[in-house]
């Protein structure tokens, strides 16, 4: 089991995963990431629709790498700090 799997499993069991997910969703909305990804999807659909229809799987495979690069470093750092805080609190409790 990797460290990511262990952290993921712990956050699910402790109930903190929902808090982390909510924080991520809020930050992505605040920084405009959701709108950027929406526009990215729209542009891909417009570009591809001229040729033929685009499946959801094709859209996801094309958008995902680009969307990941659009996540601001500040959001990534804040999430990492939150996860570290949760894990540190766990160590203190044990």
UniProtKB/Swiss-Prot annotation:
It comes from the Eukaryota. It holds the Pfam family EnY2. One of its GO terms (molecular function) is chromatin insulator sequence binding. Keywords: Activator, Chromatin regulator, Cytoplasm, mRNA transport, Nucleus, Protein transport, Transcription, Transcription regulation, Translocation, Transport. GO terms for cellular component: cytoplasm; DUBm complex; nuclear pore; nucleoplasm; SAGA complex; transcription export complex 2. GO terms for biological process: chromatin organization; mRNA export from nucleus; positive regulation of transcription by RNA polymerase II; protein transport; transcription elongation by RNA polymerase II. It is found in: Nucleus, Nucleoplasm; Cytoplasm. Belongs to the ENY2 family. Component of the nuclear pore complex (NPC)-associated AMEX complex (anchoring and mRNA export complex), composed of at least e(y)2 and xmas-2. Component of the SAGA transcription coactivator-HAT complexes, at least composed of Ada2b, e(y)2, Pcaf/Gcn5, Taf10 and Nipped-A/Trrap. Within the SAGA complex, e(y)2, Sgf11, and not/nonstop form an additional subcomplex of SAGA called the DUB module (deubiquitination module). Component of the THO complex, composed of at least e(y)2, HPR1, THO2, THOC5, THOC6 and THOC7. Interacts with e(y)1. Interacts with su(Hw) (via zinc fingers). PANTHER family: ENHANCER OF YELLOW 2 TRANSCRIPTION FACTOR. Involved in mRNA export coupled transcription activation by association with both the AMEX and the SAGA complexes. The SAGA complex is a multiprotein complex that activates transcription by remodeling chromatin and mediating histone acetylation and deubiquitination. Within the SAGA complex, participates in a subcomplex that specifically deubiquitinates histone H2B. The SAGA complex is recruited to specific gene promoters by activators, where it is required for transcription. Required for nuclear receptor-mediated transactivation. This is Enhancer of yellow 2 transcription factor. The gene is e(y)2.
């Amino acid at each position: 089991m990797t460290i990511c799997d262990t952290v993921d499993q712990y956050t699910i069991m402790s109930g903190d995963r929902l808090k982390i997910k909510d924080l991520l969703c809020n930050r992505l909305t605040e920084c405009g990431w959701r709108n950027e990804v929406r526009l990215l999807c729209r542009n891909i659909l417009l570009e591809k629709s001229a040729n033929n229809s685009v499946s959801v799987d094709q859209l996801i495979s094309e958008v995902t790498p680009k969307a990941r690069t659009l996540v601001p470093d500040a959001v990534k750092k804040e999430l990492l700090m939150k996860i570290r805080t949760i894990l540190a609190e766990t160590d203190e409790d044990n």
